[in-house]
Amino acid sequence: SAAAEARRGARTKGNRESAMTVEQFVMAYGAEQNRLRALLPEGFASLRPVLRINAEVRDGKTGALEFNTAAEKADNRGWVNIGRWDDVPFTKDGKKTTFTLPELTISFTGVGIEGGCPAEKDNVGCYYLKDGTFTLVPAEKITANKEFCDCEFAWRFAGGAHGVSPGKTLPAIPEEETTHYEKAAFTVENAAVIPCTQVLGAYQVTFER
C-alpha cells in the first residue's frame, strides 16, 4: 500500500540520516615474516609476511588509521591490530588523500581502475587489545566497488619502513621459518622498523556504516 511504501521510505531515510559515510583506504606491504613472528603476542601465529595500514575519512571530517598484521588465533584467520589512531589530520588534493601522523605519512591516489585485495577472502576479522585481552571484531561486509590506488608511505621512526606502490597488486607468499629472532615487544615502532620489501597493493572504497 501507499502507506506501507511511505513508512518504508521514512525508515530508509531515517537509517540513511544516521549512517556515516566512510572513505576507506587500505594498503598492504611486505615485511620479513620471521621478524613478524618475533613480535606477535602469545597465542598468535603469523599467516603471511605482510603489514597493513587502513585509513578512513568519516563523513568528510574525521581521519582515523590503524596498523595490522595478518595472523591466526584459535583457527580464526584474519588480522591483529598493532596500533590505532583517531582524529588523524588528512588533506585532499584532487584524487590524492594524505594522512599525517607524528609517526607516519601515507598518501593514496585513486587510479580509476576497479580492484580489491586478494587477502580479503581469508579474513574473519581483526583482534584488538582491550583491557589486557585480545578481542575479535568481525570483518565488515563491504559490497561497494573498490578502486585501486597508487600509494606512498614512510614511518618516521629512525630506520622506519617506507615504500611506493609499483602500479600492480602482488600476493604475499608465506615464508618458512629460517631465522629465529629474539622475542620483541608488540609495538608500532618495532613493527614499523621492519623494512618494507615492497608495497603489495592499495585500494579505496566508499560506503555507509
Predicted regions, residues:
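N-terminal domain-onset segments
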Residues: 1-64, 183, 191-193, 206-209
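Glycine-rich, compositionally biased intrinsically disordered regions
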Residues: 33-96, 101
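Interaction-surface and assembly-scaffold signal
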Residues: 90-209
